[in-house]
Amino acid sequence: MAVFTKKSPHFNYKVPKPVVANPIVAKPTKPTITTPKVAIIGSGVSGLTCAYYLKDSHAVTMFESNDYLGGHVNTLDVTVTERSPFKNPFKPSTEKVAIDTGFIVFNERTYPNFIRLLDELNVPFQKAEMSFSVKNTYINFEYNGHTLNSLFSQRRHVLSPRFWQFVQQILRFNRETKSLLANFRQADKMQQAALSQQTLGDYLDSHDYGELFKTNYLVPMVSAIWSMGMDDAKRFPLLFFAQFFDNHGLLDVVNRPQWFTLVGGSKQYVNALITRLVAAGTTLYINTPVQSVRRGKDGVSIEFIHQGKRQTQVFDDVVFACHADVARRLLADITETESAILGAFEYTDNEAVLHTDTQVLPKKLLTWASWNYAIDKPTARVADQKPILTYHMNILERLTAKHNYLVTLNTPINEAHVIKRVDYRHPVYDKKMTDAQKRWHEISAKRHTHFCGAYWFNGFHEDGVKSGLRVCQSLGVDIDILLTTNTTAATTAAQIKRLSKPSKPSAKFTVSKLPSHADKKLSVVQRRQVT
């Protein structure tokens, strides 16, 4: 329950430590009596982007209902203390690591606006391995598509005609999807919309793809990327899917983009943003849920609860940088158009568990990947089930640690291994949603009201930045929104060269050096906690 302002001794905010209440409220240094006042509801990447690029021209106030700033940027500082019965049992060893549980990775090809932001903040990052595995315990089937060796981690697959057909269908699907995109571009010129109406499931069913390919490769990959169940993945708009996979190099065996993680965790860029915002006189509320928003002729009235007291403030404009359904609920004078568009966005809840239990990973160490998808029931019984997905943070963040630090979605974890549980909400991508995305201009920059969030595009961090920049442009900020084209490639490459840090752990890290036998004897582990 705190306000962060320039004179507050607590402005150097570190996610997610508690904050001392009743700090000193500072008067902004730059805003004057004529400076427009803007309220931003939500402190995820879109809200923070808005605040950062508006801070020099607007008096910015940010409202966050959570006890930390950053939204899906949620880096946990973890301490694991253990004693060894073979060394000095009275002198426990302690390991401290920073683990991301929400936003983790970005790449050189499709994140130009986010990389530009990191460059302005001077926040370093490091190369990350992006690999994907599937473990289907019901049919004793697993693979990791990163290398030929890991693809055939179950050696019997070398002599399996069914597995070779599975591989062949992956290559066939990649070719046909590229042709599909070319056909769509031609059809679009001729104003034929038939292709844009198809779902991924419709396409797979009509093109004679095998069940092994559908349920153990493509649908799990879509399910994992967008944190949705298999049924929802099949309802995914085909064109939306094809464009995303093509842009991210997922239809190519080679020429895929390089992925990165932030050195020290994603909180590093959030902390850098917060420091600059407070220095500019921005007011940042946490533990402060907004209750209602009402628009008038000359501005916006926002009612909120801070430190247990209901308060009201008036602003010139409001930016909804929260989920669409939250914005819909908060608008006390919502219009029919706003209600229809915002109501088209649906969400699903996913519980993320940070833990050290390797039982959720594939059986073979060779199959362990950055992203590990698990299927533990017959296909018919997992169709409407939320995705069971494990991020191996040692691989993603190049951790040379004593323990395997894992973030798993939607499956029970042995409590002895659990470090922290975090709840996230993700948008459900369907035709209704993609249609609503095209209507943003009908409700944003109207009646002193603006909307941003990654859900207006593909749902990723770059989309959050891009969406925030779009609102900044509406509010008069002169800034370009970079597109993923050759015109920005040289600039992005120069930024990557400046910020990419080849750390020693990154250079020495290999999957074979993972602590595969760690955490087997839980009795020696005294404490797993978030500090």
What name fits each language-model region?
Residues 46, 68, 325:
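Conserved Rossmann-like nucleotide-cofactor binding loop
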Residues 55-85:
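Glycine-rich FAD pyrophosphate-binding loop
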Residues 146, 382-531:
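Conserved flavin/dinucleotide-binding core of flavoenzymes
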Residues 2, 289-427:
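Mid-domain catalytic core of redox enzymes
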Residues 243-309:
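Helical element adjacent to the flavin cofactor pocket in flavoenzyme catalytic cores
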Residues 36-62:
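N-terminal Rossmann-like FAD-binding beta1-loop-alpha1 element of flavoenzymes
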Residues 89, 108-238, 242:
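Mobile amphipathic helical/loop "lid" adjacent to a hydrophobic cofactor/ligand pocket
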